[in-house]
């Protein structure tokens, strides 16, 4: 009798258990599809893989890669100087900034990117670089907004690591006179990620307590300053050597993560902007107010590869979100001209100043990428055109 009591429920519940497993697997598959779509939209929004029209006789120097791999696959080659179409702007690039996105394209990781169209065995597009600043060289006939000689910054169709690039007119704005080309090149992806993460996802309001995890990095240095411009009480998390930097950006409090774990402290925050991706989600929940918001904008940096890479944490977050009172989600920036203009206004007003860690000439792209890979940059890493020495 006892044997029957133990075996019969198993027989009855096994189909139910299998049904639940199938439903969970379908849900996870759906989330992966959604994230793949989001990443594809992000690539389109940044103009990340749009090759310029390479026609004409003049040549220029550009970074080229024909195989996936380490920075050693990157080469400087002579390529044809692009010619703008009717809706494009030809920019003489003065500076370009490196982003983790460039690293992921170079390595071809996470591998799901290859299935999304970047090329299964070799890159379909041999060029890199999104953020740029420079001078307008020529404009298409449908571009009354700019003229030759204008100083601009924005995004350059996935080919900004070059002496010239064609950019969509909607992805550029005029550069403020009070910042350098190097500073302007640091802005597009990093600053708009911080701006949209805090404003659109975090809904930051004056007086709220906001924590920036990874406050000394490319996105983090912008996030501290933008959050302060919103009137928030800002706490920055960084390493010992970067405490003074983060304080200088306006942080009200700083936490040295080598000595203190903010996820185990008593303080609760209204908004957490996570640019690191190493803490467990349960830790963020502990550090948030009951109705707090956690915005994840990083999945671990350039070394986060594998099959789905930084998408793993957002999938886990989406599965958890319906069952908790706090809001937790990922953030992929969209390069919008009005937000570039907003950043230009903040810089003109002196409320935001881009932080530059190192600059490298175009010829030292391998060294620049290796430094980015190390993951300890204080602010942004910049490429400059027409210079021979690293500064």
Per-segment meaning from a language model:
Residues 118-131, 138, 151-214:
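NAD(P)H dinucleotide-binding glycine-rich loop of Rossmann-like/cofactor-binding domains
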Residues 263-271:
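A short acidic, Gly/Pro-enriched loop at the edge of an enzyme's catalytic core
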Residues 2-4, 8-25, 333-391:
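C-terminal hydrophobic helical "lid"/dimerization subdomain
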Residues 27-41:
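Hydrophobic membrane-insertion alpha-helices, especially the h-region
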Residues 185-256:
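Mid-domain Rossmann-like dinucleotide-binding core that forms the NAD(H)/NADP(H) cofactor-binding site
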Residues 279-352, 386-391:
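Glycine-rich phosphate-binding loop and adjacent beta-alpha segment
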Residues 82-97, 111-159:
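Glycine-rich beta-strand-centered segment in the early N-terminal region that forms part
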